[in-house]
């Protein structure tokens, strides 16, 4: 029987499958739908220092091979998360061993630092620093394009945060390997990539862009080969763990990222199509491994390089 256990930053996870931020709430919403013993961790809904309502107008738009979203980081704020939602995540961890990851966005360096400092004193296992959100007008992806800007904000957060720090990168980065090296040098413990790809949709009946911000984030199967290429580049550029995400919907998809060198993977849009997607992906990975005589993921991690 294949063993999917995965070590990420010292945490032994049930599997390499992590629920991507913004697609599984804080985990508890999925508890009755999925077998959490198959899930390695949950990255909670993206947080900002102060709660915000998110974007107005249309927020989701399906494409033939994916989903475009413009949520705009709607969230209750860091303090509310610490007081309420984090407790639910930690209960899941106690029951199933799922690693609790807090995804932190921001509109300025100061907001990132203050939010990270608050999370540093909480019970979260990992802080996922989101410098790559394409759906907010200020901050967010502004730090995810240029390596110098990314390195600076990561360095400031590193000084304020005692937790393991995973930096979530944008596919819009000018140079993926350079960006990865910059955040590693600034103190990142791990990298997750890639966030959604900036996209656009037109409503033919209204004869105008679907989203008020015009551009929004594309995820789903359409982006997977590009995300895989970026993960390949990242693994070759740094010595810290790389968590791959982008269009993973099957066990074979996840195994491609593992063979490219990813330590773990995140599953996002697939959760909207199938609430049991993470569990199913883990089962499919194990079935493939059993069929090919592979006992652990370490035997094939990075084997394609």
Language-model regions, residue ranges each:
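C-terminal helical cap(s) of enzyme catalytic domains, especially alpha/beta-barrels
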Residues: 54-64, 202-216, 258, 270-295
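Small/polar glycine-rich anion-binding or flexible loop at a beta-alpha turn
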Residues: 248-252, 274, 305
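A short, charged, Gly/Pro-tolerant segment at domain boundaries
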Residues: 298-305
């Amino acid at each position: 029987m294949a063993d999917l256990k995965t070590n990420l930053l010292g945490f032994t996870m049930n599997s390499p499958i992590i629920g991507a931020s913004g697609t599984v709430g804080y985990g508890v919403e999925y508890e009755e739908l999925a077998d959490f013993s198959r899930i390695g961790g949950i990255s909670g809904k993206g947080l900002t220092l102060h709660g915000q309502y998110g974007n107005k107008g249309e927020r989701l738009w399906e494409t033939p091979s994916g989903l475009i979203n413009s949520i705009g980081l709607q969230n209750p704020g860091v303090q509310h998360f610490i007081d309420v939602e984090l407790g639910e995540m930690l209960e899941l961890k106690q029951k199933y061993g799922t690693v609790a990851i807090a995804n932190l966005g921001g509109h300025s360096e100061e907001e990132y630092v203050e939010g990270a400092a608050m999370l540093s004193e909480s019970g979260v296992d990992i802080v996922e620093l989101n410098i790559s959100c394409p759906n907010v007008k200020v901050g967010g992806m502004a730090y995810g394009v240029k390596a110098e800007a990314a390195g600076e904000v990561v360095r400031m957060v590193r000084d304020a945060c005692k937790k393991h720090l995973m930096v979530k990168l944008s596919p819009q980065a000018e140079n993926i390997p350079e960006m990865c090296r910059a955040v590693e040098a600034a103190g990142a413990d791990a990298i997750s990539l890639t966030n959604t790809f900036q996209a656009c949709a037109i409503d033919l009946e209204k004869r105008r862009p679907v989203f008020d911000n015009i551009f929004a984030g594309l995820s789903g199967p359409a982006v997977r080969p590009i995300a895989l290429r970026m993960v390949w580049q990242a693994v070759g550029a740094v010595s810290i763990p790389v968590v791959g995400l982008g269009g993973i919907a099957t066990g074979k998809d996840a195994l491609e990222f593992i063979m490219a060198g990813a330590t773990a993977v995140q599953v996002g849009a697939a959760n909207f199509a199938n609430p049991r997607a993470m569990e199913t992906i883990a089962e499919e990975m194990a079935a493939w491994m059993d069929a090919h005589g592979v006992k652990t993921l370490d035997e094939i991690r990075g084997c394609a390089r």
